[in-house]
Swiss-Prot record:
Keywords: Ribonucleoprotein, Ribosomal protein, RNA-binding, rRNA-binding. Belongs to the universal ribosomal protein uL22 family. This is Large ribosomal subunit protein uL22. The gene is rplV. The keyword Transmembrane does not apply. The keyword Magnesium does not apply. Disulfide bonds: none annotated.
Amino acid sequence: MEAKAITRFVRLSPRKARLVADLVRGKSALEALDILEFTNKKAARVIKKTLSSAIANATNNFKMDEDKLVVSTIMVNQGPVLKRVMPRAMGRADIIRKPTAHITVAVSDEQ
């Protein structure tokens, strides 16, 4: 059985968030929470919150044992890009791209 949680439209770069996601893929859920707690990245906070939600979904909705949960899948997909304008010299303007990401975490009680 698999329980999942999705966080959408998070204001961070999907490329940088995937580096953090790779740290916890395949680990036990409680070990993954410990790793994310001490990872000094912005994405680690968001992924930890999503993982906690997936664990809560598993225990409350599917009556799974929290100690046996494993991070089965974790995906960081690209969301829409917010485009902003920054005025530059001589009447020019540059476009600033602010990326967003969708984070999906699934936990299961099977190995």
